[in-house]
Amino acid sequence: GTESGATDALAQEETSFGALYGEALPVDVPDDHYRTFYEVFVYSFYDSDGDGIGDLNGLVEKLDYINDGDDATTTDLGCNGIWLMPIMPSPTYHKYDVTDYMAIDARYGTMEDFDRFMAACEERDIHVLIDLVINHTSSKHPWFTQAVSYLQGLGDGEPSAEDCPYIDYYNFAKEKKAGSWYQV
Protein backbone atom coordinates (compact mmCIF):
# COMPACT_ATOMS: atom_id res chain seq x y z
CA GLY A 1 0.00 0.00 0.00
CA THR A 2 1.85 3.04 1.26
CA GLU A 3 5.23 2.20 -0.22
CA SER A 4 3.71 1.88 -3.69
CA GLY A 5 1.69 5.06 -3.18
CA ALA A 6 4.81 6.96 -2.12
CA THR A 7 6.68 5.67 -5.15
CA ASP A 8 3.83 6.70 -7.46
CA ALA A 9 3.72 10.18 -5.91
CA LEU A 10 7.47 10.56 -6.30
CA ALA A 11 7.28 9.50 -9.94
CA GLN A 12 4.73 12.26 -10.57
CA GLU A 13 6.90 14.97 -8.98
CA GLU A 14 9.32 16.94 -11.11
CA THR A 15 12.78 15.55 -10.28
CA SER A 16 14.94 18.16 -11.97
CA PHE A 17 17.87 19.73 -10.12
CA GLY A 18 15.89 22.92 -9.65
CA ALA A 19 12.88 21.12 -8.20
CA LEU A 20 15.03 19.02 -5.89
CA TYR A 21 17.31 21.80 -4.65
CA GLY A 22 15.33 24.98 -5.27
CA GLU A 23 17.90 26.42 -7.67
CA ALA A 24 17.95 26.97 -11.39
CA LEU A 25 20.51 25.04 -13.39
CA PRO A 26 23.36 27.10 -14.81
CA VAL A 27 22.85 27.93 -18.47
CA ASP A 28 25.94 26.03 -19.65
CA VAL A 29 25.04 22.62 -18.21
CA PRO A 30 24.83 20.14 -21.11
CA ASP A 31 21.79 17.95 -21.50
CA ASP A 32 23.34 14.49 -21.38
CA HIS A 33 20.08 12.57 -21.09
CA TYR A 34 20.49 11.34 -24.65
CA ARG A 35 24.26 10.91 -24.92
CA THR A 36 25.78 7.45 -25.45
CA PHE A 37 29.20 7.11 -23.83
CA TYR A 38 31.80 4.51 -24.72
CA GLU A 39 34.14 3.79 -21.80
CA VAL A 40 37.76 3.33 -22.83
CA PHE A 41 40.55 1.66 -20.87
CA VAL A 42 43.37 3.17 -22.93
CA TYR A 43 45.84 0.52 -21.70
CA SER A 44 44.06 -2.23 -23.63
CA PHE A 45 42.15 -0.33 -26.34
CA TYR A 46 44.63 -0.05 -29.25
CA ASP A 47 48.42 -0.03 -29.38
CA SER A 48 49.71 2.31 -32.11
CA ASP A 49 53.45 1.90 -31.50
CA GLY A 50 53.85 -1.86 -30.96
CA ASP A 51 54.92 -1.76 -27.29
CA GLY A 52 51.98 -3.91 -26.17
CA ILE A 53 50.17 -1.07 -24.36
CA GLY A 54 47.26 0.91 -25.75
CA ASP A 55 47.85 4.62 -26.17
CA LEU A 56 46.18 7.90 -27.08
CA ASN A 57 47.41 7.75 -30.68
CA GLY A 58 45.84 4.30 -30.96
CA LEU A 59 42.58 5.76 -29.69
CA VAL A 60 42.73 8.50 -32.34
CA GLU A 61 43.56 5.90 -34.99
CA LYS A 62 40.45 3.86 -34.11
CA LEU A 63 38.13 6.78 -33.33
CA ASP A 64 36.09 6.10 -36.49
CA TYR A 65 35.05 2.80 -34.88
CA ILE A 66 33.39 4.74 -32.05
CA ASN A 67 32.09 7.64 -34.16
CA ASP A 68 33.21 8.59 -37.67
CA GLY A 69 31.51 11.98 -37.51
CA ASP A 70 29.00 11.14 -40.24
CA ASP A 71 25.43 10.52 -39.06
CA ALA A 72 24.58 8.90 -42.42
CA THR A 73 26.97 5.96 -41.95
CA THR A 74 26.18 2.77 -40.07
CA THR A 75 29.74 1.46 -39.78
CA ASP A 76 30.51 3.06 -36.41
CA LEU A 77 28.99 2.61 -32.96
CA GLY A 78 27.45 6.08 -33.11
CA CYS A 79 28.63 7.02 -29.63
CA ASN A 80 28.70 10.74 -28.95
CA GLY A 81 30.69 10.54 -25.74
CA ILE A 82 33.89 8.86 -24.58
CA TRP A 83 34.58 8.17 -20.91
CA LEU A 84 38.30 7.65 -20.39
CA MET A 85 39.43 5.62 -17.43
CA PRO A 86 42.33 7.39 -15.65
CA ILE A 87 45.16 8.44 -17.99
CA MET A 88 47.42 10.15 -15.44
CA PRO A 89 50.79 8.72 -14.32
CA SER A 90 50.47 5.85 -11.86
CA PRO A 91 52.60 2.88 -10.77
CA THR A 92 49.78 0.46 -11.65
CA TYR A 93 48.32 -0.55 -15.01
CA HIS A 94 44.79 0.58 -14.08
CA LYS A 95 45.87 4.14 -13.14
CA TYR A 96 43.48 4.45 -10.19
CA ASP A 97 46.33 5.51 -7.87
CA VAL A 98 47.53 8.74 -9.42
CA THR A 99 50.99 10.25 -8.88
CA ASP A 100 50.52 13.45 -10.94
CA TYR A 101 47.08 14.87 -11.65
CA MET A 102 48.40 17.36 -14.22
CA ALA A 103 50.14 14.93 -16.60
CA ILE A 104 49.49 12.10 -19.06
CA ASP A 105 51.06 8.71 -18.31
CA ALA A 106 54.07 8.45 -20.64
CA ARG A 107 53.04 4.93 -21.69
CA TYR A 108 49.84 6.44 -23.11
CA GLY A 109 51.56 9.32 -24.88
CA THR A 110 52.15 13.02 -24.37
CA MET A 111 50.04 16.07 -23.67
CA GLU A 112 50.31 16.83 -27.40
CA ASP A 113 48.85 13.37 -28.14
CA PHE A 114 46.02 14.16 -25.74
CA ASP A 115 45.41 17.51 -27.46
CA ARG A 116 45.30 15.69 -30.83
CA PHE A 117 42.78 13.20 -29.38
CA MET A 118 40.61 16.04 -28.05
CA ALA A 119 40.72 17.85 -31.42
CA ALA A 120 39.69 14.65 -33.23
CA CYS A 121 36.80 14.21 -30.80
CA GLU A 122 35.70 17.81 -31.27
CA GLU A 123 35.63 17.30 -35.06
CA ARG A 124 33.17 14.43 -34.50
CA ASP A 125 31.17 16.23 -31.77
CA ILE A 126 32.25 13.59 -29.24
CA HIS A 127 32.18 14.75 -25.63
CA VAL A 128 34.97 13.46 -23.38
CA LEU A 129 34.89 12.62 -19.67
CA ILE A 130 38.01 11.61 -17.78
CA ASP A 131 37.82 9.47 -14.67
CA LEU A 132 39.50 11.75 -12.12
CA VAL A 133 40.38 9.88 -8.95
CA ILE A 134 40.54 12.50 -6.22
CA ASN A 135 39.50 10.58 -3.10
CA HIS A 136 42.96 9.00 -2.78
CA THR A 137 46.45 9.11 -4.29
CA SER A 138 49.19 6.64 -4.99
CA SER A 139 51.54 5.75 -2.15
CA LYS A 140 54.17 7.08 -4.58
CA HIS A 141 52.51 10.51 -4.94
CA PRO A 142 54.79 13.35 -3.72
CA TRP A 143 52.20 14.47 -1.15
CA PHE A 144 52.11 11.02 0.42
CA THR A 145 55.86 10.42 0.34
CA GLN A 146 56.53 13.84 1.89
CA ALA A 147 53.98 13.18 4.64
CA VAL A 148 55.51 9.76 5.39
CA SER A 149 59.04 11.20 5.47
CA TYR A 150 57.89 13.97 7.79
CA LEU A 151 56.18 11.54 10.17
CA GLN A 152 59.14 9.14 10.17
CA GLY A 153 61.44 12.00 11.22
CA LEU A 154 59.02 13.30 13.83
CA GLY A 155 59.68 10.71 16.51
CA ASP A 156 57.19 10.91 19.38
CA GLY A 157 56.19 14.52 18.69
CA GLU A 158 52.79 15.60 17.48
CA PRO A 159 52.45 16.25 13.75
CA SER A 160 51.84 19.81 12.61
CA ALA A 161 50.17 20.78 9.35
CA GLU A 162 52.24 23.97 9.47
CA ASP A 163 55.39 21.85 9.14
CA CYS A 164 53.92 19.48 6.54
CA PRO A 165 50.50 20.34 5.07
CA TYR A 166 50.17 16.91 3.47
CA ILE A 167 49.74 15.04 6.75
CA ASP A 168 46.14 16.26 6.83
CA TYR A 169 45.51 14.80 3.37
CA TYR A 170 45.73 11.24 4.74
CA ASN A 171 44.66 9.20 7.75
CA PHE A 172 47.80 7.96 9.47
CA ALA A 173 47.84 5.68 12.52
CA LYS A 174 50.80 4.81 14.76
CA GLU A 175 49.63 1.24 15.25
CA LYS A 176 48.19 -1.27 12.81
CA LYS A 177 44.43 -1.41 13.20
CA ALA A 178 42.54 -4.70 13.15
CA GLY A 179 41.01 -5.37 9.76
CA SER A 180 43.48 -3.12 7.97
CA TRP A 181 43.98 -4.58 4.49
CA TYR A 182 46.93 -2.56 3.26
CA GLN A 183 50.14 -1.39 4.87
CA VAL A 184 52.33 1.19 3.17
How does the language model describe each region?
Residues 14-184:
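Acidic/aromatic-lined carbohydrate-recognition and catalytic surfaces
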